Amino acid sequence: FAETGQLYRGSKPVMWSVVEKTALAEAEIEYHDYQSDMVWVKFPCEMVVRKGPTVVPGQSEWNQLASLAPVDEKLLSASVVIWTTTPWTIPGNRAVSFNSKISYGLYEVTAAPPGNWAKPGERLVLADELAEAIRKAAKIDSWERRRSLTPEELAAGECKHPLHGYPYPGEYGFRVPLLDGDHVTDDTGTGFVHTAPGHGTDDYQIWM
């Protein structure tokens, strides 16, 4: 292997047995059917204008085009919404993934029950194909679609971590980038994928 160049040093997330105190191969993992609770999580937008077109080795084409994207002030008060059945991985979040082939829209809530997680006036960024299902599941009475978002705008965007400032000021103060990934679909969820590189291979690969 060494003579043919197949031996290399790398890194990847691996399964870990708390009981055995050792790493586990994927072939050793058995999954049982389990009904999980799901949560919606809002990532407040921080759309950033990057100065001048720059080419960064290793960056995707969309991220390089992001330097040309204008910023809509309405997006500064919007939130990218993710859907997850593994809320315990949120502290490990370092990015949100989208798919440049999916159509996304900016939706402004116009009516919602008292105490709802989404309040009138809030703006949410979602995949258009899933918007109506999300509205019903989230018990939002009505909203209006304000406009479309381009892949360039999404790639130019960054979000605040949902735990920003918790439990102490300055905690989780880093920005969360939006990354283009083919593994994101509009079959279920919101069209955005919470990305925690320490909790999955897809997450790790796109984040790296």
Predicted regions and their residues:
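NTP-handling and nucleic-acid-processing catalytic cores
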Residues: F1-M208
